[in-house]
Amino acid sequence: GAVWGAIPGLLKAFRNLNEMIIGILLNYVALLFMGYLYAGPLMEANIPQTAAIEPADRLSRILPPTRVHAGILIALAVLILIYYYLYNTASGFRLRVVGNNPVAALVNGLPVKRMTVISFVASGAISGLGGAVEVLGVSYRLMGGFGAGFGFDGVAIALIGQLNPIGTGFVAYLFAVLRVGANTMQVGAGIPSAIVDVVQAIIIIFAVAAMGLV
């Protein structure tokens, strides 16, 4: 994750390319490369997926018989650490300055390019940690469709959460409830799970409008 995150970071810092576009394009490259792995050298028998992770290596469930596992604790810990770093440390303040106004940061002598790359590397590492939690706590293997839509959901969640770690956490929980609820409604009531995409789109439109971006 850190290595993958460094690519848009370097392109943003030294070529001033749009990190959003580069990130989206790299998502497709990563998905195709992952597909090569679980359908090629890591394939289990003749099924396009990797072998299942041993039960002893999986994240334990903390609220049996539900599927809630220790990954939620990891997510909360990362959320708190990021918030503390950004809003209670000098380097976190400098990083926010670079993100909000790189020109002003450069004028004041901050190493904008270096901090930009570091922030992308850290972001990629956290994304990789999220993927590891998903594998170790939910799917237990790599298979087709893994991670599909996560990147776009992440962009929407960060936007609605106004790039604040705490706000992002609450919005992520809301989106998770919508996703799980949609699957339950489809099984129990026959309501198409795609309805959640409509609901999320409406939420995003209103959130962006409230921020004055449209």
Locate predicted features:
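Alpha-helical transmembrane segments of multi-pass membrane proteins, especially transporters
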Residues: 1, 19-27, 115-123, 145-149, ...
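Transmembrane-helix boundary motif in ABC transporter permease subunits
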Residues: 1-17
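Hydrophobic alpha-helical segments embedded in the membrane of multi-pass proteins
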Residues: 2-6, 25-28, 76, 128, ...
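Helix-loop-helix "hairpin" substructures at the membrane interface of multi-pass membrane proteins
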Residues: 3, 65-141, 165-166, 170
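Helix-capping/transition residues at the boundaries of transmembrane alpha-helices
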Residues: 12-14, 86, 160
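Transmembrane helix-bundle core of multi-pass membrane transporters
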Residues: 19, 23-88, 141, 195
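Cytosolic-side transmembrane-helix boundaries in multi-pass membrane proteins
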Residues: 107-114, 180-214
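Interhelical loop and adjacent transmembrane-helix boundary motif
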Residues: 133-200
